[in-house]
Amino acid sequence: MIIAIDGPSASGKSSIAKALGSRLGFKFISSGYFYRIITLIAQKFTLNEYDLLSESKILELVLQNDIKFNGVDFLLNGVNVTSHILNERIDLQVSLYSSYIGVRNIVNKKLREIVKLKDDNYIIEGRDITTVVFPEAKVKIYLDASVKVRALRRYNQRDDDITLNELEQALERRDEIDQNKEYGKLKLAKEVFYIDTSYKCLDDVCDIIIKTFNLKKK
């Protein structure tokens, strides 16, 4: 069974998906980490956050590198890069690279291969997970929150010099990009269960999703 969790950046997708995985005994996968690894690959060949590779070049580089998920960590050519893909520079570019249709096709294929390779129960989170990648998921959840709340969450996770106001502006730009993508845009899927997490704690959101999950099982 698949529980698919969609929604904008910093809406709580990863934290809630991980907690749900622990409570339900499901395996957790984040599509966003794949896009971040691809952005990390690109940044090895660029000078700064304003320097972007073409779609054809990034696809060429992706095919030259081995990206894997071992059930816990994300590996690039056998090296654990999970802790290296959450930084401001990647934040600024990941939406741009993930807007490339070829890049999205590669990530979506990897996600489907992971699920197909081992018949198991999965919680998979990411933008367009409920609309494009796994529209057939038994349970589809869309998590949302205000920009101010999402910026504060991201601010509390960071240890760099970015300000709260800068994070708000970055999230607003990212929302605009994600909502206007030609392919895989951020939107509500059919039969999706919408949850505003702005003023809900993690356990309360998990309880709501588990109730939905139990109803869908019947």
Swiss-Prot record:
InterPro entries: Cytidylate_kin, Cytidylate_kinase_dom, P-loop_NTPase. GO terms for biological process: pyrimidine nucleotide metabolic process. It comes from the Bacteria. Its EC number is 2.7.4.25. It catalyses: CMP + ATP = CDP + ADP; dCMP + ATP = dCDP + ADP. This is Cytidylate kinase. Its main location: cytoplasm. The lineage of its organism: Bacteria, Pseudomonadati, Spirochaetota, Spirochaetia, Spirochaetales. It is found in: Cytoplasm. The gene is cmk.
